[in-house]
Amino acid sequence: MNIIEGKLNLDSNTKIAIINARFNHIITDRLVEGAKDAFLRHGGKKENLSLILVPGAFELPYALKKAIESEKFDAICCVGAVIRGSTPHFDYVSAETTKGIANVSLNHNIPVSFGVLTTDTIEQAIERAGSKAGNKGFEAMTTVIEMLNLTKEL
């Protein structure tokens, strides 16, 4: 049986964008730091990493689509944080953001990772942005690196 999997290394020319939803920036800044750390630890060059900032999670799919269409990047890592409040807004934003990123990803030939936290509390978000539960920005970047390399093998 042949096993095909992506490796966790980047060549010196790989260009990756992080698209960051600034809303809840206390959390998302930490996700970006985790993603940058993963990029550099796996062989990426600082000058080949771009950070695209959008106001909130709902804007991620549109920015993702435009970034892909620019043909400047080999892969894209989306990060953000949607934290439940006292209104149904959380449900709409988290669902549409997830669907939007998935739809854009499946309709283009470029690896995309989903590092958008959807949590019930700020404490859960903090845990996933670099404390008890690791850093989901770091994980999203390693995922997109692995998928980029897997794509080359398929």
From Swiss-Prot:
Which amino acid positions bind 5-amino-6-(D-ribitylamino)uracil, per UniProt?
Answer: F23, A57, F58, E59, A81, V82, I83, F114
Its pathway, per UniProt, is: Cofactor biosynthesis; riboflavin biosynthesis; riboflavin from 2-hydroxy-3-oxobutyl phosphate and 5-amino-6-(D-ribitylamino)uracil: step 1/2
Keyword annotations for this protein?
Answer: Riboflavin biosynthesis, Transferase
Q: A biological process (GO) annotation for this entry? A: riboflavin biosynthetic process
**One GO MF term:** 6,7-dimethyl-8-ribityllumazine synthase activity
Q: Which one Pfam family would you cite for this protein?
A: DMRL_synthase
SUPFAM superfamilies listed in its UniProt record: Lumazine synthase (SSF52121)
Residues that coordinate or bind (2S)-2-hydroxy-3-oxobutyl phosphate: S86, T87, R128
Its function, per the record, reads: Catalyzes the formation of 6,7-dimethyl-8-ribityllumazine by condensation of 5-amino-6-(D-ribitylamino)uracil with 3,4-dihydroxy-2-butanone 4-phosphate. This is the penultimate step in the biosynthesis of riboflavin.
Q: What is this protein called?
A: 6,7-dimethyl-8-ribityllumazine synthase
State the species of origin: Campylobacter jejuni subsp. doylei (strain ATCC BAA-1458 / RM4099 / 269.97)
